[in-house]
Amino acid sequence: MHRKMAVKTLSVWLLLVGTLVPQHCCQHWSYGLSPGGKRQLDSLSQTLGNVVEEFPRVDSPCSVLGGAEESPFAGIYRMKGFLGSITDRGNRTQNI
């Protein structure tokens, strides 16, 4: 009798966890998306600005593990500048 109750309880917990976890593990980014999932080029640089502004600015290197020489966010800032220059170049070629 106790075994049947344990199986039912376990089944309910697995069902509950199986339905709640996927809803909280997924994140959807939809900045500047048009129907069909296509991005507008003029809004891409604004999108990158919005995303990168969410990260805190870290001036000193991260030394949690003792081997990091560079801030983990430094690459994000460099990538923002690189992608911004590409989108600006793309906008200039389309306007010609």
From Swiss-Prot:
Residues bearing PTM Pyrrolidone carboxylic acid: Q27
Tissue: Preoptic area of the brain.
Cleaved signal peptide residues: 1-26
Positions carrying Glycine amide: G36
Keywords associated with the record: Amidation, Cleavage on pair of basic residues, Hormone, Pyrrolidone carboxylic acid, Secreted, Signal
GO MF term set: gonadotropin hormone-releasing hormone activity; gonadotropin-releasing hormone receptor binding
Cellular localization per UniProt: Secreted
Summary of the function given for this chain in its UniProt record: Stimulates the secretion of gonadotropins.
Name recorded for this polypeptide: Progonadoliberin-1
Provenance organism: Verasper moseri
